[in-house]
Amino acid sequence: MLRGPWRQLWLFFLLLLPGAPEPRGASRPWEGTDEPGSAWAWPGFQRLQEQLRAAGALSKRYWTLFSCQVWPDDCDEDEEAATGPLGWRLPLLGQRYLDLLTTWYCSFKDCCPRGDCRISNNFTGLEWDLNVRLHGQHLVQQLVLRTVRGYLETPQPEKALALSFHGWSGTGKNFVARMLVENLYRDGLMSDCVRMFIATFHFPHPKYVDLYKEQLMSQIRETQQLCHQTLFIFDEAEKLHPGLLEVLGPHLERRAPEGHRAESPWTIFLFLSNLRGDIINEVVLKLLKAGWSREEITMEHLEPHLQAEIVETIDNGFGHSRLVKENLIDYFIPFLPLEYRHVRLCARDAFLSQELLYKEETLDEIAQMMVYVPKEEQLFSSQGCKSISQRINYFLS
């Protein structure tokens, strides 16, 4: 059940409880000495003896219930039976302590054989991250939280959710993906329920696409069998082979064939791509020149252009895949190009994350080090907020 140093830690904790379980075979000074005339035969002491025995039995029940609650695989049948029916009389305060102890332990250790107990779905934290840590992406802030939360709160979704993030490098695609992972799963990217694939790293050679398909299908199936809520992230999605993306088709069809339905009720596919980021920039620049404010730009201004351009792009497998052609992607989410003011905010956040003091002049210096385009307007940072941390190190050296 408990192994290594954990056993000593929990035994020490249990000693603090009234009537903590004693080692087997340990004798008590008052047992076997109740002959007439003995001090142990005093009626008051006998009542105390009975109360101590009852307290000891209760502590053993605490321990048995807690261990079976946290380590169900290691819980022996006789231990489960010893807990008695659910209605056994556990004092209210003791139940609260037990719940607190279980919650505390499960906050940093696995408590069940599946990864489900590590799913947090912290939508409040996700909302805070999107609104406070992400800059210049009002469309992402509006759409991602609403879409993901709505999907995960649907009792029986008809299909997996597919979101495709598009935009220039450094605009926040990977940043938002990490926010999702960290707020939906306690273990983040280390969660058994999350898988991340980088196209050029995991699937580098087109000639092995059939082998990659088998491997991908196997990993998806194993992850779904382990967790009822899974997340699969595909970085550099524009470099994925169209045949490889076919594997995902059955999960994204609204009425998938019976043999191809997702084994986990909730599955999210997240695609990250720089594909057609230039189109997003062109549309945004045109709207800004026409007098629109950045915050007035809507999905209707961008998504139709973005989707059409992705389909027409010749040199990428993602646009030619069945997922795009048959509209199996739920949302193409544009990440807008970042301006000078957004770069300053990224620099400020980088200082704060390292608990470093900064001056407003320093933020300006860092922002001015970035290259801005187009050549005439000098409006958008060509690298977004990428390399901000490295530039801060320059000021600290």
From Swiss-Prot:
**Known InterPro entries for this protein?**
P-loop_NTPase, TOR1A_C, Torsin
Q: Which is one GO molecular function term here? A: ATP binding
Q: Which PANTHER family match?
A: TORSIN, TORSIN-3A
Reproduce the UniProt comment on modification after translation.
N-glycosylated.
The protein's recorded glycosylation sites are N122
Q: How does it assemble?
A: May not form homohexamers.
Q: Which residues bind ATP?
A: G167, W168, S169, G170, T171, G172, K173, N174
Please provide the record's keywords in A-Z order: ATP-binding, Cytoplasm, Endoplasmic reticulum, Glycoprotein, Nucleotide-binding, Signal
Tissues expressing this chain: Ubiquitously expressed. Highest expression in stomach, salivary glands and lymph nodes. Isoform 2 is expressed in placenta.
Q: What cellular component terms from Gene Ontology apply here?
A: endoplasmic reticulum; endoplasmic reticulum lumen; extracellular exosome; nuclear envelope
| Subcellular location, record wording | Cytoplasm; Endoplasmic reticulum lumen
A Pfam match is: TOR1A_C
Cited SUPFAM superfamilies: P-loop containing nucleoside triphosphate hydrolases (SSF52540)
Has UniProt tagged this entry with the keyword Plastid? no
Entry similarity comment: Belongs to the ClpA/ClpB family. Torsin subfamily.
Entry protein name:
Torsin-3A
Q: Where is the signal peptide?
A: 1-25
